[in-house]
Amino acid sequence: RPDQPIVGGDMGVKLRRPALSSYDTEAYLQDLKSIVFCIMIEKSIAVDHLDAILARARDRGVDMTQWGPADFSFSRAEPSLQHSEAIKPFEALVIQKSLEYGIQPRIELGSVEQAKRYIDLGVRHFCIGWDRFILRQQLMLLGSGMRKLTDLL
């Protein structure tokens, strides 16, 4: 957030990438105001103290929460939890509480088909895949298709 009395942020004018072509401080201020302020809920201790964290986040102007099932599972010394049905109550709690505090939750998906459950829980913001995984998946499909064709030669 911008370092201004009304906003309460701590980001001042700095020589960063936006300054490469020009240095319009008004445009830079607008860029800072447009940034989504997101916190991650990814540790067991964070879920244990979720109300306090979300109350403070709301007071600080946090826009979004990001649920982290992998790190949550690791922090409970249960790495396989992230792939089990037992993760769902924790995930639902984070989503429900985020919405109660007026903070939009964001969920990472591997496919569009996974979105329905989250939409039903009130989620409206998604990250679908990651570039390297999407590329790998498509390249594997292309490669296996070409292998089938060329194996017949």
Question: What do these predicted ranges mean?
Answer:
Residues 1-60, 69-72:
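Conserved anion-binding
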Residues 37-41, 65-67, 105-108, 125-128:
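Hydrophobic faces of well-ordered beta-strands that scaffold small-molecule active sites
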Residues 52-55, 89-96, 113, 117, ...:
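Alpha-helical scaffolding segments of alpha/beta enzyme cores, especially the outer helices
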